[in-house]
Structures are given as structure tokens and as C-alpha cells.
């Protein structure tokens, strides 16, 4: 596996007594049992292409845009497809103008999707394009990012602009500190003050007050120090430290305004998978440990899915999906399982409250076209 592939980040079926019996027979006795309250997952239709390191974006019409990604190694895609929940199938749409793995993909207020950067082979790109659902086509933007970025993070700000942070470039595959904002009105990129630390495979979560929490990631080493981006000042400030430094983890905004940080890996990557979890409190600017995941997992979708119940769905990096229940402060194991542990898969909440989980690869690095549906 190439070094660049290791850095990619990024986003699960039978429920019966027999399945539960088999599960408990092959797992530690102290593991949380299947919970009917946690919902279940089942296979859905397959994508048109096997993909990992792709993007999945819910469009205003309820369909999901799947773009880019890779089959394995240097087999990168320009192609894109749409998942239609009404018929439960994937269909082709226009392809991107450049092959991309782990680009930024953000739905804009206009209904179009910004796709920027990503791995293109032995390096990254600074190019960007817009997907227009009304035409089913991608168009190249005249403006380019201030630097090439692979596995950066893109976050929609309250203003409708997009904050883009970190990632890797040709000279710093371990992460960069620079940041910029995509101005939606002018369709241009504008550099802002850099982060205090270089980061790739980090998370960026919009808080209830509109600021953005940046957590984890890797520069010269895996980082524990968090930062807050304030759109009013266009600057980053340090804000507390993780109890355990991590990258390739997931993060999710809780209904009470806190942020769950779960899983990921330490400096040892495949040999350092984590099951620990912690919660960031924006009122105190500190992290506090919470109950661990039932499975160690990394290479997760960067954003855990917030359900209508207020629970957070965490999937990927394991055959099993888990639900974090804030009221209990613990993770519940979801009934059903994927065919294998899936890394760099995506998870997207649909309009009906279910969640589409698509693609990813197991330990053999061969991506799958299979998708799954989680139902609460």
C-alpha cells in the first residue's frame, strides 16, 4: 500500500436469534449485546463501481451524489453516480473533470456541490469543480485553491461559504496547516490565517454558535491539541487537548452542543486502532472521557450521523455499526453486520431518517460496490 493511500481518510444482515447466538459465541463476554433500540442494517443495492475514499452528498431532491474514490492502489475514478431512495438503486450521472480520491465535497446553499482537491495519483490537486443536479454535470471552476490538498476537510459555514482546512500536499504528505475559505458568491478561494498545527485525517465540526472545532489529525505526529475557527475573525485558537491523540477518527455534534470524538488510530496506524471515545464541551473548552466503542475502529467517515432520536451512528472500520446514546453515555451494537470491516466508506442520512452506507475496503485493500441501509 502506498504512503499516500495510508493517509487517505476520508465515511454494516440478518437479525435473528441464531445470528445473535453466533455473535456472542465469537466475541468477548463483556461486549454490549445487540440492542433492538439501536436499529438494524441490511444490504442495499450495489454501486456501479467499487469505491473507497469517495464522497457522498445528500442533494436537495433527496438523492445522494457519490463521486470519485478508488478501487485499489492507483485505480482512481472520475465517475459519479446517484442513489435514489425512492427506487433503492444507483444510476450514472456526469463524471468529474479530474480523478479524485478523498476530495472535499460540500453541498452549497445554491443546491450545487463543491468538489475540491483530492489525491489524483502520486500527488494532490488544487482544482475544484461544481456539480449541478439540474443538469447532472460537473463544471470546472476558474478559481483554484491556494495549494494542492488531499484528504482536507470542508465545512459549510453559517454564511454559506466553505472552510477548507489542512490535508496533505506534495511536500508534506503528513499534513499541512494552511486553511482557506471558498466564497460561494464569487466562486473564489481566499486564504485565511493557518491553523496552529499541520493536520491531515482530522475532523472539522460546526458548533451550535457557528464556530468550527478542529480535532486530531496528523502532522509530524498525531495531534491531541484541538483548535477553534471563528468565522468572525477568520482565525484559529487552541481549545483543549484530547485525552488520547488520534487521527482517522469520527466526530459528531450532539443535540446538547457537545461533540463526540470516537475511534481512530494513534502513531501506530493499523496496529494502533482505538475504541476510546471522548466528548468536547464548548462551554469549558475541554474533553472528557465517555464509555468506549465496542470495537476498535479507524479510517472512519469523518462525521458520525446524527439521528432524529439524538443518537449518533458510528459505522466503518468494523463489521458492526454502533449507536451512541447520549442519555446513557454508552455505545449500543446495531443488529446486522457488513460482509467485512469497511474502511473509508461513507454514511449519509436520508430524508426518511434511514442512513445509506456505501463502499469502503477491508484489509485486502479491494474496495466494494456494496451498500447498506441502516434503519432506526
Task: Describe each model-derived feature in a short phrase.
Residues 22-376:
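Kelch-like beta-propeller repeat domains
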Residues 14-24:
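Hydrophobic alpha-helical membrane-insertion segments, chiefly the h-region
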Residues 11-13, 40:
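Generic short N-terminal amphipathic or hydrophobic helices
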Amino acid at each position: 500500500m502506498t504512503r499516500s493511500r495510508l493517509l487517505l481518510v476520508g465515511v454494516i444482515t440478518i437479525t435473528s436469534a441464531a445470528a445473535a447466538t453466533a455473535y456472542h459465541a465469537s466475541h468477548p463476554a463483556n461486549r454490549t449485546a445487540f440492542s433492538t433500540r439501536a436499529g438494524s442494517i441490511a444490504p442495499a443495492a450495489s454501486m456501479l463501481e467499487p469505491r473507497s475514499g469517495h464522497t457522498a452528498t445528500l442533494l436537495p431532491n433527496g438523492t445522494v451524489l457519490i463521486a470519485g474514490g478508488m478501487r485499489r492502489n492507483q485505480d482512481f475514478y472520475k465517475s459519479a453516480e446517484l442513489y435514489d431512495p425512492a427506487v433503492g438503486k444507483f444510476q450514472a450521472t456526469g463524471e468529474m473533470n479530474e480523478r479524485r480520491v478523498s476530495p472535499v465535497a460540500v453541498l452549497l446553499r445554491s443546491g450545487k456541490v463543491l468538489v475540491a482537491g483530492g489525491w489524483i495519483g502520486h500527488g494532490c490537486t488544487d482544482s475544484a469543480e461544481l456539480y449541478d443536479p439540474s443538469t447532472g454535470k460537473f463544471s470546472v471552476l476558474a478559481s483554484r485553491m491556494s495549494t494542492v490538498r488531499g484528504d482536507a476537510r470542508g465545512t459549510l459555514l453559517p454564511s454559506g461559504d466553505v472552510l477548507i482546512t489542512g490535508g496533505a500536499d506534495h511536500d508534506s504528505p503528513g499534513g499541512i496547516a494552511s486553511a482557506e475559505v471558498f466564497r460561494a458568491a464569487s466562486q473564489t478561494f481566499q486564504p485565511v490565517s493557518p491553523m496552529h498545527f499541520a493536520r491531515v485525517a482530522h475532523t472539522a465540526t460546526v458548533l451550535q454558535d457557528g464556530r468550527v472545532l478542529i480535532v486530531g489529525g496528523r502532522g509530524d505526529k498525531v495531534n491531541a491539541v484541538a483548535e477553534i475557527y471563528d468565522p468572525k475573525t477568520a482565525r484559529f485558537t487552541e481549545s483543549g487537548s484530547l485525552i488520547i491523540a488520534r487521527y482517522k477518527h469520527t466526530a459528531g455534534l450532539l443535540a446538547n452542543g457537545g461533540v463526540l470524538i470516537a475511534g481512530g488510530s494513534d502513531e501506530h496506524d493499523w496496529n494502533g486502532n482505538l475504541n476510546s471515545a471522548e466528548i468536547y464541551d464548548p462551554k469549558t473548552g475541554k474533553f472528557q472521557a465517555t464509555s468506549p466503542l465496542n470495537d476498535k475502529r479507524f479510517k472512519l467517515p469523518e462525521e458520525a450521523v446524527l439521528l432524529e432520536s439524538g443518537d449518533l451512528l458510528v459505522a466503518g472500520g468494523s463489521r458492526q455499526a454502533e449507536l451512541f446514546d447520549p442519555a446513557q453515555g454508552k455505545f449500543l451494537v446495531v443488529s446486522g453486520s457488513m460482509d467485512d470491516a469497511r474502511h473509508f466508506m461513507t454514511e449519509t442520512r436520508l430524508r426518511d431518517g434511514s442512513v445509506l452506507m456505501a463502499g469502503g475496503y477491508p484489509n485486502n485493500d479491494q474496495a466494494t460496490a456494496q451498500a447498506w441501509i441502516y434503519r432506526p
